Amino acid sequence: MFGKGGMGNLMKQAQQMQDKMAKVQEEIARMEVTGEAGAGLVKVTMTGSHSVRKVDIDPSLLEDDKEMLEDLIAAACNDAARRVEENQKERMAEVTGGMQLPPGMKMPF
């Protein structure tokens, strides 16, 4: 099935890919993205591990409806989470050469 040294090369390649994926996972955890809502009136900065680092609210919103502000904060959080997911997929595609992960498998593992 494998030529001379084929299995050894395959194992070496698998180890290299695993090392690259671990490095990318660390980079993803350290990255920060900012999600926005209300045309930038509410901004949420989130890490690659989905921890919210900062919430920025335009002062003009503090005089308005509390419920609207809550909705905008939730929307900005969701936008930031979506951006984290997009960045994770892009970075992992670079490592895996575009190979798709099985459905339901998320990165980092």
UniProtKB/Swiss-Prot annotation:
Transmembrane segments: none annotated. The keyword Cytoplasm applies. Its main location: cytoplasm. It is found in: Cytoplasm, Nucleoid. GO terms for molecular function: DNA binding. It comes from the Bacteria. Keywords: Cytoplasm, DNA-binding. Pfam families: YbaB_DNA_bd (PF02575). InterPro entries: YbaB-like_sf, YbaB/EbfC. One of its GO terms (cellular component) is bacterial nucleoid. HAMAP family: DNA_YbaB_EbfC. Binds to DNA and alters its conformation. May be involved in regulation of gene expression, nucleoid organization and DNA protection. Belongs to the YbaB/EbfC family. Homodimer. This is Nucleoid-associated protein Ssed_2851. It comes from Shewanella sediminis (strain HAW-EB3).
